[in-house]
Amino acid sequence: YHSGYEDKFLRIMEEYKLTSGIVVKGEEGTSHFSLRLGKPSDTERKAINYAQGFRPKDQEKTPFAQDVDPAAFGYTYDQNPRLPEITSQSFAEAGLAALSGQQGPVYDRLILNTALTDHLLGLEPDPDTALQHAQEAIESGRALNRLQTYIAATNQK
């Protein structure tokens, strides 16, 4: 998102009575956490990997706002990795390879994003458990199976 929209997005989520919601200032305008934090947030600007939202706790919505530092979870990259070829085909192939268990930056990105999103939304009690569950979903083949089931269902005429 662009700065200034986070509160608007969160307000819309609350108006729709969602029990949890998150906005992420992701890399290159996406809603995905980068594998590097870069400069932390300050009073003037929000960092890449800044997450803000709310989650349920004790029957109430609890707000949160924080930078997500991948290094705190064991992901240490000097530069944010990029695929050699930037095409939809290369992204799809890399994603399928990662969901098949191929280790590397795309795999790390999937684990980090899935786990931290689940944790921040209150679906997992802590980041370490969330990371473990995300990794188990890929290593067991459950994540790839879900994607393949979705693709098959959407291709039916």
Q: What residue spans do the PLM features occupy?
A:
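Glycine-rich anion-binding loops and their surrounding alpha/beta cores
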Residues: 1-157
